[in-house]
Amino acid sequence: MHNYLDFEKPISDLEGKIIELKKLATEDESIDTTDEIGRLEVRVREAILEIYSKLNAWQKTQVARHPQRPHFVDYAKTLFQEFTPLAGDRKFSEDAAIQAGLARFRGQPVAVIGQEKGNDTKSRLKHNFGSPRPEGYRKAIRILEMADRFGLPVISLVDTAGAYPGVGAEERGQAEAIARSTEMCLGVKVPLVSVVIGEGGSGGAIAIATGNRVYMLEHSIYSVISPEGAASILWRDSTRAREAATNMKITAEDLKSLGVIDGIISEPLGGAHRDPDSVIAATGDVIANALAEMSSRSGEQLRNERRQKFLNMGRNL
C-alpha cells in the first residue's frame, strides 16, 4: 500500500478512484472500466508532474523521509555483488545504524559504508532509526583503514537525521568518533564517492561524506540541523519547520549552487519511492562514472584534491 504525503492528496484521490474501478471490474466482468481508468491514469501523471515540479524545501524534506523511499539495504542488494558486512568497532559493540563492509561494484572490489534507518518497527529499533552511535563511526573508520591499506575505492551512501545524541553515546565519545571518521575520510589515498540518498543530517552525515565526489538525489536534503531543530532554536517553535527549511538552503539545488555538492541525481517522477529500481540504477551509473574519472589519479593526488575541496568550501561559503 502506498503512503501518501499531505501535499499528495490530489494524487491520492485519483489513484483511490483507479483502485475502486479495478475492484469493480473484478467483481462484475460485464462492466468495462478500461477507458475511465486510462483517463484517470493520465490525470495522475499530470497531477504528479504539477506537484513535483514545484516542491518547496519542506516538501522535499518530507519526500526525503518517505517511509517507502529506498534505503541503504535496497541499494546494497542491487548495486553490489558479494557484499560482506563487517560488524563491531573492536572497542565496545556493534552499531547497526551504520552498515559497512567489502563488496564488488560492477566487478571492481570496493569498500562500502552506509546508514540504514530500517523499514518497520523492529528494523527501525535495530538500526536506531539510522542515527549512529560512536561504535558505528569507529566501524566506518575500520573499513576506511582497510580500504586505504588494500587500495579499495570507497562508496558511502548517506541517510541519517543525525548522529545519536543520547547520554551513553556522548559518554563513549560521540564527538570524537565523528571527528575521527571525518579525518579518516579526508586522509585515505583512494577514491571516495558519497551519495546522499535521503537525509544528510549534520556531522552524523558528513562523518562518512567527505568524499572526492559528493552527490545528492534530487529530493534528498543535506543540512547542519533538521528544520524542526532549527525552528526550535531560532524561534522556540518547531511548527515553523517549513520556514526554517526554506531559509537553511538544504535542497540539492541549493547545495549545488553553493558548490557544496558535485552533482544531482534525478529521481523518477513522484520521487524515488515510486520507482526504486530506476533511481538505484541511475545512482550506480553516477558512481561508476566518478570512479572511472578518478582511476588514473595517484593516492596523494586524490587525498590532496579532497582536502583542498573542503578547505575551499569553508573559505568560499
Curated annotation (Swiss-Prot):
Gene Ontology MF terms: acetyl-CoA carboxylase activity; ATP binding; carboxyl- or carbamoyltransferase activity
Keyword set, alphabetical order: ATP-binding, Cytoplasm, Fatty acid biosynthesis, Fatty acid metabolism, Lipid biosynthesis, Lipid metabolism, Nucleotide-binding, Transferase
InterPro entries in UniProt: Acetyl_CoA_COase_a_su, ClpP/crotonase-like_dom_sf, COA_CT_C
GO terms under cellular component: acetyl-CoA carboxylase complex
Subunit and partners: Acetyl-CoA carboxylase is a heterohexamer composed of biotin carboxyl carrier protein (AccB), biotin carboxylase (AccC) and two subunits each of ACCase subunit alpha (AccA) and ACCase subunit beta (AccD).
NCBIfam families: accA, AccA_sub, PRK05724.1
Protein name: Acetyl-coenzyme A carboxylase carboxyl transferase subunit alpha
Taxonomic path: Bacteria, Pseudomonadati, Pseudomonadota, Alphaproteobacteria, Hyphomicrobiales
